[in-house]
Regions:
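Low-complexity, glycine- and small/polar-enriched segments
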Residues: 1-280
Length: 280
């Protein structure tokens, strides 16, 4: 994995044996980019193994917890406890957005992530949004809460949320559709074609959208080993597959996925016709 990353990002042409030495010679900022990539990949794999009956670690969060312990150990090199604090709170129109590609990663190892608070409805640009291709990856020690805001990939890309000790709640945002200009093919002077990322971003909650066939579907992974996953009133919409691993899942009927669903309890449907016949 390191070799491929170095070749893609830096054009590394050396051997696999020399890859580590090359990596250690990079600036600390670049080393952290790769470390975060590996970290979130491990969290995602650990969450999926939990619901994979063919995995040796089915029903276990061991892989993810080992990754967390590696990046955020409880003690320093001298054996002294490490105290971490801090919560990310996004008020009103605040948020993080990328245009024309680029992912979003947030780490709150000492607190919670609050994306939008209750009260005045925020604008559609608030929350965590990728408006080109790009993933959203979130780790929080405590809960990940959406008030009236959103976490969305609107033009391809997946969403990963791991709450180590808290809940994941998609909030109470409105589902009212807000229509925008559909994506258009844009041609430059050389005849190259790009797609405009200004796509419909309707409603709130958690969603991966693929508004046109050219856009790949995005998967969603929600992991809360000690908490509850709740789509709330805003709901969770997934253009690809969804994997949920949590102590409890509620309001499962408000989770919509076009692909495969894992870890979501089956919603019992009431046979209205049978009830009507019985009461006749």
């Amino acid at each position: 994995e390191l070799l491929n990353w170095l070749q893609t990002r830096f054009g590394y042409t050396g051997t696999q044996d020399g890859a580590l030495a090359f990596y250690l010679g990079l600036p600390a900022e670049q080393q952290r980019v790769f470390a975060r990539s590996v970290y979130f990949n491990e969290l995602q794999a650990g969450g999926r193994e939990y619901n994979d009956p063919t995995s040796r670690r089915v029903g276990s969060y061991l892989r993810g917890r080992q990754a967390i312990a590696s990046l955020f150990p409880d003690k320093d090199a001298q054996g002294r406890p490490i105290q971490r604090d801090g919560t990310i709170t996004m008020f009103g129109p605040s948020g993080i957005r990328t245009d024309f590609g680029g992912g979003i990663q947030t780490l709150t190892p000492g607190g919670k992530l609050i994306v939008g608070v209750e009260g005045q409805v925020p604008p559609v640009t608030s929350g965590l949004l990728t408006q080109g291709s790009g993933d959203i990856q979130i780790y929080s020690k405590d809960s990940v809460l959406l008030g009236l805001s959103r976490i969305m990939t609107t033009f391809g890309g997946g969403i990963l949320v791991w709450s180590a000790e808290g809940d994941i709640n998609a909030g109470r945002g409105s589902k009212t559709s807000l229509l925008y200009t559909p994506p258009l093919r844009v041609y430059d002077n050389a005849g190259n074609v790009t797609l405009s990322p200004q796509v419909p971003s309707s409603g709130a909650g958690i969603a991966t959208l693929n508004p046109i066939p050219e856009v790949p579907r995005g998967d969603v992974d929600l992991i809360a080993p000690l908490g509850t996953v709740d789509p709330g009133e805003a709901g969770i919409r997934v253009s690809g597959d969804i994997n949920v691993a949590a102590l409890r899942v509620v309001n499962a009927a408000n989770i919509q996925a076009q692909g495969e669903s894992r870890g979501i309890p089956t919603v019992a449907l009431v046979n209205v016709s049978a009830l009507s016949s019985a009461s006749a």
